Amino acid sequence: LHAAGVAAVPVHPLSAVARDDDAAVSLPTAAVGGLRAEGFVPVFHGDVIAHAGEGVTVLSGDELVTGLAERLDAARVGLCSTVPGVLDSEGDVIDSITDFESVAAALGDSDSTDVSGGMAGKVEELLALARPARIFGPDAVGAFLAGDAPGTLIDGGSAD
């Protein structure tokens, strides 16, 4: 990001985020807002975080994206993945997804499924978000940032 001229700064969830005993996540929205107001781009990643009564638990990057999008009223939401979008069983990018059941079979195991559920976890998390979002690959980051609509649209019922 720095090489592309983006004033990116890391925000490490272990140092700034926690779950309460009901598993609700507190996010550093004031700090994020301050960084953004000064022209910085906060960059988060999945991490372990303190969880009241549990020690630590995993906070996925997907959960961070949706939590911050909701709390900061994001105008656009995008997740960059290792593939150019959500792929169907033939390996083609699915244009849009509005419900999980219609794509569940294609979202079985992936080559990079992790503790957050891989692509299926991303789709489920974004379907629960009350706004449209996109999943795209690394080659489409510039297009997404320029306002284009690469990859797969995920929309679980927003008003848009």
Located regions from the model:
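C-terminal catalytic "cap/lid" subdomain
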Residues: 1-160
